[in-house]
């Protein structure tokens, strides 16, 4: 079972020490990550917490390290391997060592409190998927969206507005519980993708970072959208000496906060 051992109540100074320690151990976390099983296997989660990455129909492909995958699978499996290793290292959450890939219409969806859509600029959900996601979120689920930039916003906004036509995408304030539950996220540093750091700087970020969210009637955060950021890349490249460790550490902090919020709200 998930235990936080009072860490959410620790003073800011101590949490800053934890943050500094995270910088020193990012590579150790990456080196200690596990090999994944077939992500479509299994009827139930393997532990109290297991990430479910959402599959969606797309012909577009992208990736790094010479591997091109469907847009929903970009950064797999390195992102999950490294992040789940960090989650196990810094919390007492009972965390599975593998992940799941599910369609929104999969009946197993409701067994996973935290789901992830990567590259939502290429996400065009069907009516059945829209209905399933709305029900999932209103029944207590949590959705993170990551790695979309610039003009991707319009496609994402069209999709998410079909899920919640009556709810506004709002700026997530720094004092939101999701930003303070474990680490105090009082900075808004932009997390670049690997492609933004290579090629002689020719690939530029397409705007400032934005944290957008959708809340339910009790002001529970159901959706977090990391716009003009690439948290998945920061996780994936934790073992890459060419990717800045401070960015990976910050991405770990965000992800850990999101997970703990999803499990406790």
Label each PLM-derived region with a short phrase.
Residues 1-14:
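N-terminal secretory signal peptides that target proteins for export/translocation
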Residues 17-28:
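Bacterial N-terminal signal peptides
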Residues 32-114, 120-121, 222, 230-265:
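Aromatic-Pro/Gly-enriched surface loop or interdomain linker
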Residues 51, 109, 114-155:
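Short alpha-beta junction capping motif
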Residues 91, 141, 163-167, 262:
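A generic secondary-structure signal for well-formed alpha-helical elements
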